[in-house]
């Protein structure tokens, strides 16, 4: 589980029904002069995830699968090689609450133009703010959640695949148009 303050891994052994867990501090926070801005270093997070995976691989040789959970509203931008080209903008990021047009904040403005619920901290509200303010990295090719980024890195791929449940958590999602 890739949480905002900690990252943990769990091994479940079905024959003995035993559970072993490892928890590590998520020390990836990036300081900012703006108190509304909440970012983390995506590569530090991935290094912690890899540390946990390696620890389990050393202790347990017959791991049959890996499941990933974590912060579901935040986004990280990736380039065509699948490398992070931005920090992880976490679910706590408040840029969507900043004033925009017609005395509305970014989240409300996006909700009004799309017709979909939108809240500050949701990935597509963050992305909307970043677009409007020229903050999307020039080499950004995709965006994804930190879980999708972790799965991409663990599997050796260079394009994130977003599960519909994660896509829905970013906001502005219509399950009927899947």
Q: Where are these predicted regions, by residue range?
A:
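Gly/Ser/Thr-rich active-site cleft segment
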Residues: 2-4, 110-178
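Acceptor-binding helix/loop patch of EC 2.4 sugar-transfer enzymes
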Residues: 102-110
